[in-house]
Amino acid sequence: MQQLQLHDVWEKLRPRDESIELGHYKKALQDVEKVLKKNPTIQCGRALKAWAFLRLGRDEESAALIKALEQETPTESTTLHVMTLCYKETDQLDKICQIFTSASKQLPGNEELLSQLFIAHMRVNDFKAQQTVAMQLYKLKPRNPFYFWAVTSVMLQALRGPDAKDQQKSSLLLSLAQRMVDKLIADNKIEASQEVQLYLQILQHQEKYQEMLTFLDGPVCTNLYPGAPHSIKIDLLKKLNKWADLNKLMKQLLTEDPDRWDYYQDYILSTIEMIKCKDETPETDHTVDMCHEFIAGIIESQPRKNRGPYLARLELARLMVKHKFDKEQQFGELTELLLDYFRMFGDKTCCANDLKLFLEYVEPAKRPGFAAQLMQECRINPVTLPSSKEHMQRHICSLQIARFCGAHAALSEEHLSALYTALSLHYEHGYNTFGQGLLPTDMGPSDPYALLAVNIMYDRAWKLQRSEPLVEALCLLNHLLSNSINNFHGKLLNLQLYHRLGLVEAAHRAYESLDIKHIQLDSLGYLHCSHLCNGGFPALAKQIFDQTLHFFINDTNSVEFLKTSYNFGSFSKLIEFLDFRDRLSNSLHFTLISVEALLLEMVCFSGTLAQNLAAYRLMRIKPQEDRIKWDEMSDNRDLTIFVHWDPTVEQLREECQKDSFSQEHELLQLRSGLLRLVSSFIELFTKGGDDEYQTAQDLSRHWEELFVTVRAKNRQPACERFLVNLLPSRLHSVLAMPYEAVFRDLASFLLALWKGEKHDQIRSGAERCVKHVNDLFELIAGSIKTYNSSGDLLWNRKKVHDTVNACVEIAALVLFVMTVCFDKYSQAPAPQPTRKTKKKDSEQNNHEPAVVLMTEKNRLQLVVDVLRALKTNLVDCEAVLSSWELPLLSDSLAGALEQMSLGAKSESAVRLKLMDTHLGEIKELKKLLKDKLKLINKSI
């Protein structure tokens, strides 16, 4: 009966998701305690109680129960499972190994416990211990899976263990893993294709490519792994420089599948390499003429047009240009071949992307002429429209290539406006003629016209430095998305435009429409999350941060993928899963959002100080520890999500992406430094030990050094010349705002205040803090005043938006720290001023005066001075925020939109989003300031 009751309690405690209400845990705890009253020695019940305590934030009580259970060395599976959950939540994975080691010693020969012990070692990447346990299991039950657990563990020691960087030890371990498998091969005990794949992997890591090739063609691989991908053999032949064999293989594969673009690339590569080494092996195509003849033969023999061989012909021409073959050897101008390709496949949506692959090898001076030829091929002029969907697609392709060749960059503002008008009308015609009756998931065939038009309008706005073209672009996008509700390219441009204008709530709606989930939260979250920080909408930011962190926290259970791989013998996937787990756990985006979420929580603290400190404790911040692996940060951003047709060099784009990652890395350093510095202040004034003082002092010094280092690199914001580009990093906003000075002087004041020795330094520190507070709110008022007097409010909104929100964040963090200081000194007894005395003989000899500490009352008064400055400015700030004018759309703009047939519907939708975002931001900021006022009023 008791076991049944415990099972019921277990089900009640088990979290269905991370957002389970706190009250459920209280009820579960009550149920557990009822059972324990009847039988207080039940280990499972005490484990459940410890877990409930943990979820309720009562960590110390939970730790005491778990420690008592550890000493009893439990062996019952449910108890061990609950203890495992507790250790996972407190990030004590090594303790899981300890309890299962103790349990397996109590019950030697227990397969389940040994298997769980193996998995426990797997969680902490203790590959040596994995090997030991796997061999114990194999001796207990001689099965191939257990043996290959051991083989895999040896391989992982070589690749990812402590000795992985020692070339000699790593080689020895890989040799051991190979010999272990060789033994089974000799005994004819290999049973599965996954075991064969693991052996190939071991050989590959040793770079024994010839052995791999021999084994791949041998009887074991042929029988157990008949479906081995051709790519394995192709890669081996390339690494072994067996170009003739590769050439023969690729000819055979292309004969069977003549539309494989990747096969053509390897086939042409083999021909070029054979030419270089003058290899004329029979039955190979060892000249460009033979290669061209083979490709031409496939083109002539195919019953229908396939892109593969035509792309191959372009690839051959490209490589001949790259390797500087004589013009006599080349098969015509590359531009002529590209033009032929356009004539053949211009009606395909992929044609423009195909042509982009080769345009880099066309001389820049010839590109505009080539683009003009494409336009002529379309036979569309200002008074004609496409006659069919295919005709329209050819026109779209020619326009995209024209932009890529730089044709639009040279246009004047008037020509850009005319081109925008033409593209918008083409979109309307295409939608009305060819875009009816499509499925909701389909993108309209004329949608690319609208996307190009939006880019054109951004170009125009950039030239004019005005917002009206951007509003027109937003209206067109709104119209596009009402027709093609799932056009994610349009949604991405919408998101970009709203963020560039500092309209966070409108950008959030665009982000939500993308329906980003799962791994996309890491790869695409950068599009929005980073700009939510200090975005003026803390509730929205919390929602997105929680959603993102929920994915990453749950993905710590990706260890289950590894467990499944071991259980099902999918050994070849283990390295892939381990790499994937490392990329997620070291994701720059995840780490930055983790830090930002904690800072946001502090900024939004409201209620009583006791409630705030309780919430702070739940964050489990340890300022003395830097838990970020800075050298292992991973850039998981998907930077290919945008389709761009801007005339940028790919090499420059790659350099910009690397620089962007470096800037985000430095932003993370500054934000993490801020979080740890503020936390060190809280620890100092709540615990008040010498260790806490030393930590705060070290972090204060680190804060100053960080800014010196980052400023010395002189990073430049990402270029905003084109719409489809990375948004400028928030690093520049942090450097421009007074973060450095405010928290440097705050640290100096608080450290001196805690010591209480240098009275003048303490008073001057308090005065500097008061001045910083006044300056912050003057900066808010000044930026809003400048904005209100600017001619184009919407164009200048982003700057004032960043300034206001940064200043509010700084003020909120300072306020939280000062309320903690106030609490410390207001509750302290009022002793007489303490005096550090020295021995009389020492005083007589050195004539040094005694050090008189500042009284608690005087310290409290200085803290109150800072809080009063905050209070005064917070009260005044409400009126300042109310004066922040709403950007209004001009009547001429409405008329222009009407002429474009976009109608009032799109214009009113954009106007409403603009108004809601602006007024909503002011409302959210006022609410935040009111919460801060309430917090101050409860203190002073």
UniProtKB/Swiss-Prot annotation:
TPR repeats lie at residues 77-110. Belongs to the MDM20/NAA25 family. This is Phagocyte signaling-impaired protein. One of its GO terms (biological process) is innate immune response. PANTHER family: N-ALPHA-ACETYLTRANSFERASE 25, NATB AUXILIARY SUBUNIT (PTHR22767:SF3), N-TERMINAL ACETYLTRANSFERASE-RELATED (PTHR22767). It comes from the Eukaryota. GO terms for cellular component: lysosome; NatB complex. Pfam families: NatB_MDM20 (PF09797). It is found in: Lysosome. The lineage of its organism: Eukaryota, Metazoa, Ecdysozoa, Arthropoda, Hexapoda. Keywords: Antimicrobial, Immunity, Innate immunity, Lysosome, TPR repeat. Its main location: other. Component of the N-terminal acetyltransferase B (NatB) complex. Non-catalytic subunit of the NatB complex which catalyzes acetylation of the N-terminal methionine residues of proteins beginning with Met-Asp or Met-Glu. Has 2 roles in the larval immune response: required both for the phagocytic degradation of internalized bacteria and for the induction of Defensin in the fat body. Within the phagocytic blood cells, has a role in detection of infection and activation of the humoral immune response.
